[in-house]
Regions:
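Conserved nucleotide- and phosphate/pyrophosphate-binding catalytic cores
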Residues: 21, 31, 136, 151, ...
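Active-site cores that bind ATP or allylic diphosphates and position pyrophosphate for catalysis
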Residues: 62-190, 195-202, 210, 235
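Short beta->alpha junction loops/turns
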Residues: 12, 41-44, 109, 164-167, ...
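A generic structural motif
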Residues: 9-11, 155, 162, 274
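Hydrophobic residues in beta-strands and at strand termini
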Residues: 7, 108, 350-352
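N-terminal Rossmann-like or analogous alpha/beta NTP/dinucleotide-binding catalytic cores
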Residues: 1-81, 170-183, 223
Length: 353
């Protein structure tokens, strides 16, 4: 199979190049290499509009002139009646053309259910009364998330969509778009979100950090990959996997159906293991930048490699390993003394030493 990477950047307010650069750098550091060229959604707006225009022509989509304020009033009225807040479809049969401030909506069926077999959660059915005529193209001409990903997945030949279960509610909407276009559905799988040790939604207070922060904290990339894999997938009782083993053994049937808790201590356990397993020359290369940050700018991989075995058995990350090696370097270095400090703190007897 292929692993394709797509940058979903249609939300221009939340999408910046530095964010994309950080994502790509983090994936490369983790060894998560993708196949083919990167796909940027902002470079495909003509394609999305082509598909949306065809949906309008076929009667599966329509122009809507309702303002956001009018739509909110519809929803408030529905809430007041104890009904599900939704757009009431008043523009469905008006036959409007394009115009300033107008959006394009999907004309969903008026009755029936959307059903699919999730590879993790099993059979899922949603009554169309729970949905409304979702927007496909915003008033600024940009496609919505659900519209863009359906076109992308179809054009990129995506066969399996595996994502967090916070996207389960999007899937019926996307299936309706697939059906309107007459396209074959991919297989959907929704994995549970990772929780903290207290079984609450994972946050920074649980130790969740960005990939760059873990890298700066002296974590090895494969330790992080191994730890994350075990939170969402299993192969018997096996804990440790090489990257090739993960590729060879992965089977969607073994995706966890219940949420797992992230344990920072377990991550350090993985990291300590891979520190001990990493060849000495590779470990010297990895720890060198952390040693140089401590002021030993003349240190080289060759000069510190003999010192690595002295501390790696007890270190949990590269920072701890660098701290241990630095102690030896401090002792062997010809460090200058602060003359003012010597005069202030050392007695005449001490100066003799």
């Amino acid at each position: 199979g292929e692993f394709r990477l797509r940058i979903e950047d249609t939300d221009t307010e939340r999408s910046k190049q530095e964010y994309t650069d950080a994502i790509l750098a983090s994936m490369r550091w983790l060894g998560l290499d993708w196949d083919g060229e990167l796909t940027y959604q902002t470079q495909r707006t003509d394609r999305y509009n082509e598909v949306i225009d065809k949906m309008i022509e076929s009667g599966h989509a329509y122009w809507c002139s309702c303002t956001p304020e009018e739509v909110e009033a519809m929803r408030e009225a529905a809430r007041a009646k104890g009904e599900k807040p939704r757009y009431d479809g008043r523009c469905r049969e008006r036959g409007l053309d394009a115009g300033p401030g107008r959006v394009v909506r999907l004309k969903i069926p008026t009755e029936g259910r959307v059903v699919f077999d999730d590879m993790v959660k099993g059979h899922i059915a949603t009554d169309v009364s729970e949905l409304d005529d979702m927007i496909l193209r915003r008033s600024d001409g940009m496609p919505t998330y659900n519209m863009a990903v359906v076109v992308d997945d179809h054009d990129m030949g995506i066969t399996h969509v595996i994502r967090g279960d916070d996207h389960v509610s999007n899937t019926p909407k996307q299936i309706l778009i697939y059906q309107a276009l007459g396209w074959e559905l991919p297989v959907f799988g929704h994995v549970p979100m990772i929780l903290g040790k207290d079984r609450q939604k994972l946050s920074k207070r649980h130790g969740a950090r960005s990939v760059v922060e873990y890298q700066n904290d002296g974590l090895l990339p494969h330790a992080l990959v191994n730890c994350l894999v075990r939170l969402g997938w299993s192969h018997g009782d096996q804990e440790l996997f090489s990257m090739q083993e993960l590729i060879d053994l992965f089977d969607g049937k073994n995706l966890n159906s219940s949420a797992s808790a992230f344990d920072p201590d377990k991550l350090l356990w993985f990291n300590a293991h891979y520190l001990r397993e990493t060849p000495l020359d590779d470990l010297a290369r990895l720890v060198l930048p952390f040693i140089q940050q401590k002021g030993f700018t003349d240190a080289t991989e060759a000069s510190i490699e003999p010192l690595v075995p002295l501390y790696r058995e007890r270190a949990k990350n590269l920072i701890e390993l660098a701290d241990g090696i630095a102690q030896l370097l401090y002792k062997s270095a010809d460090l200058p003394y602060d003359e003012a400090g010597v005069a202030k703190w050392l007695t005449d007897e001490g100066k003799e030493y």
